[in-house]
Design a protein with these regions (language model features):
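Small beta-barrel nucleic-acid-binding modules, principally OB-folds
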Residues: 54-72, 207-222
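Gly/Ser-enriched beta-turn/beta-hairpin loop segments
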Residues: 50-52, 203-204
Length: 292
C-alpha cells in the first residue's frame, strides 16, 4: 500500500501562535481541513461531488496526537491517506511534518461519513468510489487510541464558552469548519483550568502553560450560522503534571449535543518546554472539583 499523498504545505504564522508560544490547536484543524479536502477531492468526494450529486463527507470523529511542537516560522507539510473503507464512509489518516527536521509532529485519524447533503442521512459509497479509495490505502503506525471512562451526565460541569455561530465560519462544503469548533474548545479550556488555579495571571507570573498532547473529538450534530452555542467542561483526571478534561458543546436553542472533546495536556514549563509538576495547592484544588 503506497497511497500517501501530500495534501498541505505551508508555514506557521505569528498570529496563529497562542499564549503557550506554539501553533494553537485550532489552526492545526485549519490545516487538517485543507488536507482532508485535498484527499477527498483526489478520491472524487470533494466539493465538486457536493455540488453535482448532493453528497458530502462529514467528519464524525478525530483522534489526534500532538507529538512535537510547531512554533513561529516553522515550515510544515501534511501527508494523507486512507486507513479504512467502510460502506458509508472512510477513515482518513494524516501525518503533520516539520519540513525542516523531517520529524512527525502530529498524527490524525479522521472518520468521515458519506451523507445526503440536504437530509444528512447515510449514503453508501458506490463501487467505483470504493475502488478509488482502496487505491489510496496506506500502512499506519500512529499511536494506538485509548478509550477511557467518561461521566454519564453533565453534573459538575461548568459553563466554559458561549457565543453565536458566524456566517464566515462556513467552509466550502457549506458546513461550519472544524477549526471553529476547536477555537471554542480552546476558550473553554482556559475557563476550565482557571477554576482550579491555572489562571492567565498564574501562567504569566510563573512562566507556565497548558500544552495539549491528545484530542478525541466526536461530532454528532450540525451547527449553522446564528445558532447559539455553549460549551460545558469538567476536569476528569489529574496526575503529577497531566490533566484530562471533557468538553461538551450544545446548541442552546435546541439543547442538541453537537460535539464532545476529550482533551489531554500537561502543565508546561514555558522556558524548558517540558512538563512541570503541578504545585500542591493547584493539584488539591483540582482534585476537589474532579468529575468522575
Amino acid at each position: 500500500m503506497s497511497g500517501w499523498r501530500e495534501t498541505y504545505r505551508g508555514i506557521v504564522y505569528r498570529w496563529e501562535v497562542d499564549h503557550n508560544d506554539h501553533l494553537t490547536v485550532a489552526f492545526y484543524f485549519a490545516r487538517l481541513g485543507d488536507a482532508a479536502r485535498g484527499l477527498l477531492d483526489a478520491l472524487g468526494l470533494g466539493p465538486d461531488q457536493a455540488r453535482r450529486r448532493g453528497r458530502l463527507c462529514l467528519t464524525t470523529d478525530c483522534y489526534v496526537r500532538y507529538l512535537r511542537e510547531l512554533r513561529v516560522g516553522d515550515i510544515m507539510h501534511i501527508a494523507s491517506g486512507v486507513l479504512a473503507v467502510e460502506p458509508d464512509g472512510l477513515v482518513l489518516v494524516h501525518k503533520v511534518f516539520n519540513t525542516e527536521t523531517g520529524e512527525v509532529c502530529t498524527t490524525v485519524e479522521q472518520r468521515v461519513h458519506h451523507v445526503d447533503a440536504r437530509r444528512r442521512v447515510s449514503r453508501a459509497l458506490t463501487p467505483a468510489q470504493r475502488r478509488v479509495a482502496e487505491g489510496q490505502r496506506v500502512d499506519w503506525d500512529g499511536p494506538a487510541r485509548e478509550r477511557r471512562p467518561r461521566p454519564a451526565g453533565l453534573e459538575g460541569f461548568r459553563d466554559s464558552a458561549r457565543d453565536t455561530v458566524k456566517p464566515d465560519e462556513v467552509d466550502v462544503f457549506g458546513q461550519v469548519a472544524l477549526t471553529h469548533y476547536v477555537h471554542r474548545f480552546s476558550a473553554a479550556n482556559g475557563h476550565a483550568t482557571a477554576a482550579f488555579g491555572i489562571t492567565p495571571g498564574y501562567m504569566r507570573t510563573e512562566r507556565r502553560g497548558f500544552s495539549t498532547f491528545e484530542f478525541q473529538l466526536e461530532v454528532g450534530g450540525v451547527l449553522r450560522p446564528g445558532d447559539p452555542v455553549c460549551v460545558r467542561s469538567a476536569l476528569v483526571h489529574v496526575g503529577s503534571s497531566s490533566m484530562r478534561l471533557l468538553h461538551v458543546m450544545t446548541n442552546e436553542r435546541t439543547a442538541e449535543r453537537i460535539a464532545t472533546l476529550e482533551q489531554l495536556g500537561v502543565h508546561l514549563d514555558m522556558d524548558a518546554r517540558r512538563p512541570s509538576p503541578l504545585p500542591d495547592a493547584i493539584r488539591e484544588r483540582a482534585k476537589a472539583i474532579l468529575v468522575v
